Amino acid sequence: MNSYTETEFFVGDIPYQMYVQYYQPRPDQNSVPIVLLHGAFHTGTCFVKTPDNRQGWAVYLAKLGYSTYIVDLPGHGRSGFVPDLALMSYQRIINATVALLQQIGPAVILTHSMSGVVGWQTAKTHPKLVKAIVGIAPSPPADLLPATTKNSHEVFPEDRPRIQSREDTKKYFTNSDTFPQENFENYFCSLVAESARISNELRNVEGRGLYICHPEILYDIPICVITGDQDPRHPYKVDAETAIYFQGDFIWLPEVGLPGHGHLQMLEHGNLAIADLFINWLHSKGVI
């Protein structure tokens, strides 16, 4: 395994700047960089260590010799305070992601959940900056979602940020057999407030989601969607449709001998086996 060094910097415009942590392997193999984008309510720390102090994906990738970047999305964690967090849109995050890729060069984007849309839109508008996309239970493009009505219980008021409840966390995030349940409190206190507008855009409330319209723009970009069998909001059919829409590959973890995974694959027991899975897939596509 390689050693690595860590450096930090920011990209983007105030107040929507984005914190970036760079893991540079030694020796640096000059590999295609891998950018890890976290999901809603999280920060980049979810890729550093697990709640029970096991090695996270960012450190593992760097030790294998891959240049790895993790971020705190604008308005999250070390990126700093955003006065209108409740009203912050997906486009702010996409802009910051593009700014990062313009600085470091074309990269693999690994997305999780909410940031799935960021990956699709970044590839749509700047396809030459995206070498491949690995979507971990990614949010689908709005093209695959019905327009939610304003009166739905899934619509969130945009006069305040969203706070993830303990009940919903246990129901949707940490329910799996492979999550380290004895360390739930360590995980729960790491969660942060989230933009209500982004949550509504994700659900395509009143047709406000972000559409691709021409998925063929992404056909030349290798895409892989990876989903576990214990993820309540990402059943097989939903994530398989996302992969098919982009003519990508779909990995259902039980089918490759990895059952019992939920929404937080990077934190669950067996997380490094999943990392090996997408690393091997990237190799098979000639990306890294």
Which residues fall in each region the model found?
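Catalytic active-site module of serine/aspartate enzymes centered on a nucleophile-bearing elbow/loop
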Residues: 252-288
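Conserved acidic catalytic loop of the alpha/beta-hydrolase fold
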Residues: 91-108
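Alpha/beta-hydrolase
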Residues: 144-241, 248-249
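Short beta-to-alpha linker loops that shape the active-site pocket of alpha/beta-hydrolase fold enzymes
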Residues: 40, 67, 72-77, 139, ...
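Glycine-rich "HGGG/HGxG" loop immediately N-terminal to the catalytic nucleophile
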Residues: 71-87, 259-260
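Short, surface-exposed "cap/lid" segments of acyl-processing enzymes
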Residues: 28-30, 34-70
